[in-house]
């Protein structure tokens, strides 16, 4: 297979409309745009959300909420993800090294999702009640 020989499957693409090729084609003269008006002109049309001069919906409704900057640097870690970490100690740096969390993450919380197969030591991470019970049941421990 070569890139220059690739083509779409037969019948997968519709032929483009050939506009302005005589009245017999059905798309001659006005080319499917009707007569006059803003939408018939080249470059004609209105922007998204424009309601003809009436105050548009997105401006009639109040602003609300914000994006928490802390949420951008916080991540959840599942119990099943702990198996991807080499070694017995799990902290922020070992999670980043194992590609479990992104490089920009500064806070992480271990949640109860999946199972933990081996005893691990959690260091410097927040842990939910259920995850704490599962880690301790597997013989692991949590260090603050």
From Swiss-Prot:
Residues 1-53 are annotated as: Disordered. PROSITE patterns: RIBOSOMAL_L15 (PS00475). The keyword Ribonucleoprotein applies. GO terms for molecular function: rRNA binding; structural constituent of ribosome. GO terms for biological process: translation. Keywords: Ribonucleoprotein, Ribosomal protein, RNA-binding, rRNA-binding. GO terms for cellular component: cytosolic large ribosomal subunit. Residues 21-31 have a biased composition (Gly residues). InterPro entries: Ribosomal_uL15, Ribosomal_uL15/eL18, Ribosomal_uL15/eL18_sf, Ribosomal_uL15_bac-type, Ribosomal_uL15_CS. Gene3D superfamilies: 3.100.10.10. It holds the Pfam family Ribosomal_L27A. Part of the 50S ribosomal subunit. Binds to the 23S rRNA. Belongs to the universal ribosomal protein uL15 family. This is Large ribosomal subunit protein uL15. It comes from Pectobacterium carotovorum subsp. carotovorum (strain PC1).
């Amino acid at each position: 297979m070569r890139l220059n020989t690739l083509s779409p499957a037969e019948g997968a693409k519709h032929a483009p409309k050939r506009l302005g090729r005589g009245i017999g084609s059905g798309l001659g003269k006005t080319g499917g745009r009707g007569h006059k008006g803003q939408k018939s002109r080249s470059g004609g049309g209105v922007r998204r959300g424009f309601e003809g001069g009436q105050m548009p919906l997105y401006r009639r409704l109040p602003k609300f909420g914000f994006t928490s900057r802390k949420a951008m640097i916080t991540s959840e870690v599942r119990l099943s993800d702990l198996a991807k970490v080499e070694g017995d100690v799990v902290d922020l740096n070992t999670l980043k090294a194992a590609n479990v969390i992104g490089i920009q993450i500064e806070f992480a919380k271990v949640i109860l999702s999946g199972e933990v197969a081996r005893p691990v030591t959690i260091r410097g991470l927040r842990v939910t009640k259920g995850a704490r019970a599962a880690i301790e049941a597997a013989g692991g421990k949590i260090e603050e």
